[in-house]
Amino acid sequence: MNSVLALIAGAILPLAFAPFNWFPIAFVSPAILLAVWLRSRPLVAWWRGWLFGFGFFGAGASWVYVSIHHFGNANVPLAVLITVLFVFVLALFIAFQGLSFSLFFRKRKAALTALFAFPAWWVVWEWLRSILFTGFPWLFLGYSQINSPLKGFGPLFGIYGISLIVAFISGCIYLLVTSKKLNKKIMCLILIILPFIVGWVLTFIPWTRPGSESVRVGLVQGNIGQRLKWDPDTLYSTLHTYYSETQKNWDHGIIVWPEAAIPIYPQQVSVFLQALDKEAKQHNTALMTGIPIYHEKTNKVFNGLMVLGDGHGLYLKRHLVPFGESFTSSKICNLLMKYFDIPMSDLSPGPEDQEPTVVKGIPFAPFICYEIAYPTEVLNHLSNKQFIVVVNDDSWFAGTIAPAQQLQIAQMRALETERYLLYSTNTGITAIISPEGKIVKSAPQNQRLLLTGQIKPVTGKTPLMRWNYYPVVGIIIIFLLLTFL
C-alpha cells in the first residue's frame, strides 16, 4: 500500500506546476512521501523513492517522447523505450534521496526529521540533480509557488530557498496530521501559515530600481515547423516571415527573433544581414536574432544570438542540451547522432567570458533555451545587466506541457533578479515577464505574430544577486545540525 501511495503522490505532483498551477499539491505530495519514508527501511525507502520519482517525472517530463519520435526519426517502440529510460534515470535521484534519508535520519526524532532534515535533504538533492550528468534542473518544488505568496522569498533566497520553505511546510503538514497533542497541532498550523504571511509582506519590498523611461519591444513568433525551418528550400520563406513582421514595426526600440530564427550561418546570408543591420540603424532599432555561428578557423559551430542595428554583441550559448545539441566523442554517441539526424546536434559550448551584449546603450543578459533553467549560471552571468532576453524554440515539444513549464522557470529567473525578461520563442509561448515574475503579455501558441509591450531597464541588485545561495547553504547546514540535537 505504501508503495502505491508513493507512486500516486509522485504522479500528482506535476499538477502543482504550469500549466495546471495547483500549487497546494506541492505541499501535500512531499508530505505523503515523508510519511512513507519514515516507515521504511533504507532499501525499501530506495524503492518507494524510485516509485515516487517514476510517477513524478513520468507525468511531468515524459514530453521528451515528442522530440525523440517526431523529430528524432525514432519509431514508436524505440521512442517509448528511450523515454522510459530517461524517466527511470531521473527517478534514481529520488530513490537515492530516500535511501540516504532513511540511513541518516529515520531513527532521529520525528519532529526534528520532518521540520529540518526533510527540507534540507530535499534541496540538497534538487541541487545534485541540477549538476550531475550535465544536470536536469526541472520541476523544482519552488517553481510551483510562482503564483503563491511564497514568491516573496524569491529575490532573497531564490528557487532553492523557496523549495526549502515548501518542503518545510510539507514536514509541518506531516506533523499536523500525526501529532496527537493539541498544542503541537496549533504550533504546526502557525508554522504552516507564517511563511505565507512573511512571503506576502516581502512582495511589497522593491529591491531594485526601474528606470524612468520605457522601451517599446516586439517579439516575433514565426511559428515555423522544425522540418520546414531546417529545409534549405524554405530558407527564403523563413527569412521573409521574420522580416515582414519586423518591417511593419520599426517603431519598436527592440525587436527579438527567437532561437535559430535564421537557420543558416552568417557567412551564407551576409548580404541579408548587412541590409537588415543598416535598416535597423536607420530606424534606431536594436534587433537581435538567434543564429548558428560557424568559426572557420576552429571548424566549430555554436548556437548564437546576434545583435544588429542600435546595439552590438554576439552571444554564444554556454550550456548545451546533452544529446540534443552535443554528443560525446564516443562511437556509440556518434552513431546515435547519425541515426536520429537532429539539426544542430554537434555544437560547441561558448566560452565563459564573452563580450557584453548591449541594445540602445542598455546592457542585457542573453540566454538560449535550456540555459535559463540553471539558477546559479544565470546569477553568475547577470552582473550589471539591466534586463534578460531568452530566445527559445519549443516546437521540439509541441503539444506538450514543456513550454509552459519552461516559461514558469523563466518567470522565477525574472523574480529572483527583479529584471524584465523577454521570452521569445518560435511557436510559443512568447511572453514579456515583469520583475515581479508576472506574465505581462503572452502570445497564443502556434500563431504567427509580433507580441508588443514595454519594458524598463532595471538597476540595483536583489539580495540573492548580492549573496548568491550562501545563505540557503547556511540554513541547510543549520537544519542538518539541528536534526542531530
Curated annotation (Swiss-Prot):
It comes from the Bacteria. This is Apolipoprotein N-acyltransferase. It is a multi-pass membrane protein. Signal peptide: none annotated. InterPro entries: Apolipo_AcylTrfase (IPR004563), C-N_Hydrolase (IPR003010), C-N_Hydrolase_sf (IPR036526), LNT_N (IPR045378). It is found in: Cell inner membrane. Its EC number is 2.3.1.269. Residues 220-457 form the CN hydrolase domain. The gene is lnt. Gene3D superfamilies: Carbon-nitrogen hydrolase. Pathway: Protein modification; lipoprotein biosynthesis (N-acyl transfer). Catalyzes the phospholipid dependent N-acylation of the N-terminal cysteine of apolipoprotein, the last step in lipoprotein maturation. PROSITE patterns: CN_HYDROLASE. It comes from Coxiella burnetii (strain RSA 493 / Nine Mile phase I).
